C-alpha cells in the first residue's frame, strides 16, 4: 500500500496531455481525486472523462500559468470540490523559442521565466499554508534534464528548468519542517506534443537514443509513475531532490 493515494487530492497543471495527462491518470488509478488543469477546458474534460470511465474521480478546471488570478481560482475550485489539496504538481510550462540565444528577445525570455518558475512559486505560496496546517503535503515540479546541460536550441527553456531545481531546494528548506515534501522530476526526451520539435528531428532523436542506456526516448507513463512515488508514502523521506528519469542519458558517459 506504499503507493496508495486513496483520500488524497491532487492538482495537476498542464494535465490535459503528455506527461501531465499521464500524471493525472496514474494518480487517479492509485486512488487520488484529481483536479485536471490546463488552458483549454475541453481538453481537460476529455482527461476527466477517461478517468471516470475507469472508476476514478476527477474534475476539470481551466487555468493559465501566466495568470496569477487564474491559478488562485484553480486552487479555490479544488478546495471547493474536495475540501483540501494534498498534492500539487506543477507540470505546465512554456517554450515559445527554439533557436540560439543570439536571437532570443527579452520579452520572450521574461515570459519563459515567469511561466516556468514564478508560477511554481505562486502555487507553492497558495497551497503551502494549508499543507503546513495539516503537516502533510507533496509539492512536485516537473523540470527537465535540460536543467543539467547546455543547449544550442532551447537554452532559455533549460535555464528556467535549472532555476526550478534551485527553487525546489529552497522551498524544501522553507517548508520541510512542516512535513511538506518538495521535489522535482527531470524527464529526458519524452514523446509528447510539447517536445515534438525535438523528437521529430531525426538528428536530435537519434543522438538522444544513442546516448541513453535504454536506447530509446521516453513515453509519458515513464514519468507518471515517478510522480506517484513522490506523492505517496513510498516517497515520504524524499525532500529537496530531483529524480532524473531519462533512460540513462545523464551519467551514461556518452559523448
Which sequence ranges carry the predicted segments?
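Conserved glycine-rich cofactor-binding loop
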Residues: 9, 16-17, 40
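Short C-terminal tail/terminal secondary-structure segment
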Residues: 98, 149, 228, 239-255
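Substrate-binding pocket helix/loop in short-chain dehydrogenase/reductase
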Residues: 99-101, 105-110, 208
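Active-site helix of classical SDR
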Residues: 124, 160, 168
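Residue(s) in the substrate-gating loop at a strand-loop-helix junction
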Residues: 144
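A conserved structural motif in NAD(P)-dependent oxidoreductases
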Residues: 212-223, 234
